[in-house]
């Protein structure tokens, strides 16, 4: 799952700040890289003319789980080449560092990745830049080394995105922010600990993508979800939310424990190069949660 964090390549940017900046959606502050602006679709910074970026991701899991997944073999399966790995002392903690290469659209990108945390939290700082942009790479690495984690700082996840939902009148409670997406669950925890495993997520595209047939694209995206080989689409219906057209899919499938689950899936297309995506899942009370998922989706709005 973590490997999908590396695939976004096209970004926008511009700015210079000489003081620590709290990165929205995280508990981290850092010196913004020179010539970069705050990203609009993820937690971090981006630069337009080079396609470079720094992304910070916080995950509610033991950081060694993430470290152990960064093997040459697993990265290679995602088209990533591990060049080297090391450790460094980072704000009093041990950080695992990785130097990775990836080719996309005939361009080779270098990636510098820091992973640190504790037995309950993993923080991943991912810097990416074209191989030929060595000066930009030095700026990114310097900025990455300035990251400071403060658990008492509010994550401000809702401020990190340009959309909003209102769960009032539903069983869903805001549970957190992850990689540009707002998360909701029945118990307000991430990951959820409720027996029904009911969750709802809303996010957006990271970069431009050519979309010729929005219906076909929606179907292809639901079929790309984890364990989608057992997913059966029950209905697919045109939908308009906040004056943005798209499609709603109701499906049934299985989770990683092979338990049956309801899948509610919505994609909205403001144009042919971007989208907003909403996903609701539950292992029980299908009719009740389907009603809640639909009600929550209908509150989607842009800020």
Model-predicted segments: where are they?
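Surface-exposed amphipathic alpha-helical segments
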Residues: 16, 25-26, 32-38, 125-173, ...
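Surface-exposed flexible segments
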Residues: 63-79, 135-146, 196-208, 285-301
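Long, acidic/polar, low-complexity amphipathic helices and coiled-coil-like
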Residues: 44-54, 94, 99-145, 149
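Secretory pathway targeting signatures of secreted, lumenal, and periplasmic proteins
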Residues: 19-69, 107, 164-222, 255-258
């Amino acid at each position: 799952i973590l490997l999908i964090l590396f695939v976004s390549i096209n970004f926008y940017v511009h700015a210079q700040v000489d003081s620590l900046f709290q990165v929205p959606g995280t508990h981290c502050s850092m010196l913004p890289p020179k010539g970069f602006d705050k990203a609009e679709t993820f937690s971090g910074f981006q630069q337009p003319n080079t396609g470079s970026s720094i992304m910070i991701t916080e995950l509610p899991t033991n950081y060694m789980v993430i470290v152990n997944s960064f093997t040459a073999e697993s990265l290679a399966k995602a088209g990533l080449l591990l060049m080297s790995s090391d450790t460094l002392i980072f704000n009093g903690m041990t950080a695992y560092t990785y130097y990775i290469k990836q080719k996309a659209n005939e361009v080779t990108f270098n990636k510098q990745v820091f992973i640190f945390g504790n037995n309950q939290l993993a923080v991943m700082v991912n810097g990416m830049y074209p191989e030929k942009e060595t000066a930009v790479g030095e700026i990114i690495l310097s900025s990455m080394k300035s990251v400071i984690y403060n658990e008492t700082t509010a994550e401000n996840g809702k401020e990190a995105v340009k959309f909003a939902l209102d769960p009032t009148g539903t069983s869903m409670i805001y549970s957190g922010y992850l990689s540009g997406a707002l998360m909701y669950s029945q118990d307000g925890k991430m990951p959820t600990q409720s027996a029904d495993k009911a969750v709802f997520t809303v996010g957006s595209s990271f970069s431009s993508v050519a979309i010729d047939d929005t219906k076909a694209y929606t179907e292809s995206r639901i079929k790309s979800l984890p364990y989608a080989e057992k997913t059966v689409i029950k209905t697919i219906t045109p939908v308009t939310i906040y004056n943005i057209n798209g499609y709603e899919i109701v499906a049934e499938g299985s989770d990683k424990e092979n338990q049956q689950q309801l899948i509610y899936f919505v994609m909205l297309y403001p144009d042919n190069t971007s989208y907003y995506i909403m996903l609701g899942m539950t292992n029980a009370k299908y009719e009740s949660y389907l009603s809640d998922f639909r009600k929550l989706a209908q509150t989607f709005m842009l800020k």
